[in-house]
Design a protein with these regions (language model features):
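C-terminal alpha-helical "lid" subdomain
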Residues: 2-58, 273-274, 281-362
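Phosphate-binding P-loop
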Residues: 100-108, 146
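Mid-core helix/loop region of P-loop NTP-binding domains shared across ATPases and GTPases
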Residues: 51-65, 148-150, 163-170, 178-236, ...
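N-terminal pre-Walker A segment at the start of P-loop NTPase domains
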Residues: 77-98
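Post-Walker A helix-loop "phosphate-sensing" segment adjacent to the P-loop in P-loop NTPases
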Residues: 131-143, 177-179
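Conserved lysine of the Walker
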Residues: 121
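Hydrophobic positions on the alpha1 helix immediately C-terminal to the Walker A/P-loop
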Residues: 124, 128
Length: 362
């Protein structure tokens, strides 16, 4: 926890270097410690657990067969395939972190990941954040005898109806900075900025940014707070939200300020064709190669690419949910393979079912 003490002159808290509890030990797949796993990823303990836990991996040649329960757990978690949006975001984050490394006066360049629901925005954000975390710990391992592990990445969710105080409190909660109802927003902000810089945060990921509405008084104050934080915290900020360019975030004076500092990355549906490539079919191939089913016929998913593209509208979130549910069904019913009938039987989210399920041909 971070200790705050009021100064005699101002009564404002001054923060001591962060006293962070030891993170959970890295664990193998599907054996996460219950207590460690209970921390949300919007706390640094939860983030450490997420970043250092080995992600699900497909079966490897020569590997002992997994049990039924292990395979069910594997398809429940499943792999993250590298989509074009993830590749673009990873490249841009790496470049902007270098670009802003020695920028001291004004806010560093930022990124905004935008797109429709179920397009993989949060997945891309978390994947790039984990990569940054692991790269930093490899580059700068903890000093011998150090009580505090590195905290290079912060992940914050914008709360519904965010005000400046509730938003800055979310920043404080991530590092366990104690706050009270009697503390002013300025006091919490001072503690957050000091502690984030002391802890060495280099990348701040802010999800659900579309929840901010600068057209309201409280929303405008929250947007101003974000601008203040980007200027005071020595880190690269990456935002993600639903169709951000069509929201009030990009309009008016405040919107113009954000648009002038941020590079936009569109995380949209995977196209069936892009020039000479087939991004959607390539993703299907990657997902199929990751399956752990005993009797699945290779090539089945790419063969049904037109049907799957229409069914999911090319959205990676809907697609991975469909494949995961179909795989779990195949294990449960003993067929151990995904067929067109298996895919047809899966009920997806309401939006996909209402707008994109192909009409049955008679």
């Amino acid at each position: 926890m971070v200790n705050t003490h009021p100064t005699p002159a101002t009564g404002h808290p001054t923060t001591q270097p962060p006293q962070l509890p030891e993170p959970p030990e890295p664990s193998g797949p599907y054996t996460a410690d219950t207590e460690a796993a209970s921390w949300p990823v919007t706390t640094w303990q939860g983030w450490q657990h997420f970043a250092t836990t080995e992600p699900p991996a497909p079966p490897q040649p020569g590997q002992a067969p997994r049990t039924r329960e292990e395979r069910l757990a594997y398809h429940s978690a499943f792999v993250t395939v590298r989509t074009p949006a993830i590749n673009t975001l990873a490249h841009q984050v790496r470049t902007l972190m270098i670009l802003g490394r020695h920028q001291q006066i004004t806010a560093r360049p930022s990124l905004i990941v935008t797109g429709p629901p179920a397009a993989g925005k949060t997945t891309a954000l978390l994947h790039v954040g984990r990569t940054c975390h692991l790269a930093h710990t490899l580059r700068t391992p903890p000093t011998q005898g150090s009580a505090h592990p590195a905290v290079p990445v912060a992940y914050v969710l914008v709360p519904p109806g965010a005000t400046a105080k509730t938003l800055t409190t979310e920043f404080a909660r991530y590092l366990g900075i104690p706050t009270t109802t009697r503390m002013t927003q300025a006091q919490i902000t001072d503690a957050v900025c000091h502690t984030y810089n002391t802890a060495g945060i280099q990348l701040v990921l802010i999800d659900e940014i579309h929840r901010l509405n600068p057209r309201t008084t409280t929303g405008a104050q929250a947007a101003d707070l974000l601008k203040d934080l980007t200027e005071r915290i020595r880190a690269t900020f990456v935002y993600a939200g639903i169709d951000v360019t069509t929201t009030p975030l990009f309009t008016g004076v405040r919107g113009a300020q954000l648009a002038a500092r941020a590079t936009l990355i569109h995380c949209g549906p995977l196209p069936a064709h892009h020039g000479q490539t087939r991004p959607f079919t390539d993703t299907l191939t990657d997902l199929e190669n990751a399956l752990d089913l005993h009797h699945h016929t290779p090539g089945t998913l790419p063969h049904h690419a037109p049907y799957l593209h229409q069914r999911t509208a090319g959205r990676i979130g809907s697609l991975t949910r469909l494949i995961r549910q179909a795989a779990i069904t195949a294990i449960h019913n003993g067929t151990e393979k995904i067929t067109k009938a298996t895919l047809d039987a899966v009920q997806l989210d309401h939006h996909a079912e209402t707008h994109h399920r192909p009409t049955t041909q008679h």
